[in-house]
Amino acid sequence: MVDNQSLDAVFHALSDPTRRAMLQALSEQPRTVGELAAPFAITLAGASKHIQVLERAGLIAREVQGRVHTCRLDPGPLH
């Protein structure tokens, strides 16, 4: 069973259209932070803030190799 705090984090993450678009992009394939930021008028730092919200909700996972951060969808909390 999902606890209310986890559910609140998921709904908060999904409440923003930019984060929903990022999840849509990640549903197609893993992407770097730069690739996720490119379609929007936001900086890499701004994209990183959105990614942190998605990570805290458990919706994505981030892999770091050197300076490259690659994100992938983790739909577990939605099941």
Mark where each language-model region is:
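N-terminal helix-turn-helix DNA-binding core of bacterial DNA-binding proteins
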Residues: 2-45, 57-58, 68-79
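Residue cluster at the C-terminal edge of the helix-turn-helix DNA-binding motif
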Residues: 55-63
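Short, hydrophobic-biased segments on the C-terminal half of alpha helices
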Residues: 51-52
